[in-house]
Amino acid sequence: ATEDTAVTYTAAQLLGNGWPCARDREEITVVGVIAAPAVERAGRTDFDLAVRESSAQRPLPGLLRLSWYEAPTQPRPGQLWRLTLRLRCRQGLANPGSMDRELDLLRQRVVGTGYVVAKAPAELLRDEGLAQPIERLRARIAQRIAASLPAGPSVSVLQGLSVGLRGNVPDELWEAFAATGVAHLMAISGLHVTGCSLFVLWLLRLCWKWPPVGSLRGRIAAEIAVVLAVTAGYVLLAGASLPALRTLAMVVLVAIQRLLRRALPLHLTLALAAALLCAADPLAVTSVGFWLSFVATAALLLILDAGSGWRA
């Protein structure tokens, strides 16, 4: 009941903040910060804008998902722009077996969609160095990858696998991934996050074998601090998808248990991780990825538990 109330309240609040359909295609002038790395498509640039000021005579507490056709320059995270926009309400198709776009926009706190009016002046006011630091770093890594490799689909694939920016992957490549059954590998999930955590832990265990540091006390606390810091940083750089956040929550819970020298059953740890995610974002339960992630992990735990019983 508590979860239902939280979901209902959050959804009602977000729905009330959305751009009204009665004002579709209305032009407004806004001042806002680029909130995420832009995606270049054929003839247009897609990006999210966090509005600070607007002529709309109503608050816009969320993101605007915008397209800019023939943009003179690529907007970068942290830049403050004054733009004239033509907005539409948050709408989308919801066909059986396909993604519910309107619900997806709602989960991402997008209050409206639209495009930059080409004939109106667009002004870059300043680059706010402290705004959107994680997104700025993601964009910088993606740019370095693009500059280091010859142009081609491999650039977008590496950007997707490293910092979770998959918007530049060509449609034909997605079709090839789907046909060969490897599309899921493009999503940074629990496999990647767990691998990162275990690799860092392995490096630390190697360091403890070095005599100058091998005799230091507090090694368990040091391991936990370093592993959590690196894992959290990787999840943020990867875009903080639901599967990655689920794994991070489980890593945090396991670390706490190790620090307290207490062990909980894995299924209870999984349940606590789900509760943490729902507390942080009640709308997570509306995502297919949430259920796939937790159900798949629960199934693996059941299989492992059954396997241990057979061995016994």
Residue ranges of model-derived segments:
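Membrane-interface helix/helix-cap signal primarily in integral membrane proteins
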Residues: A1-H184
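Hydrophobic alpha-helical transmembrane segments in multi-pass membrane proteins
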Residues: G114, L165, V169-A312
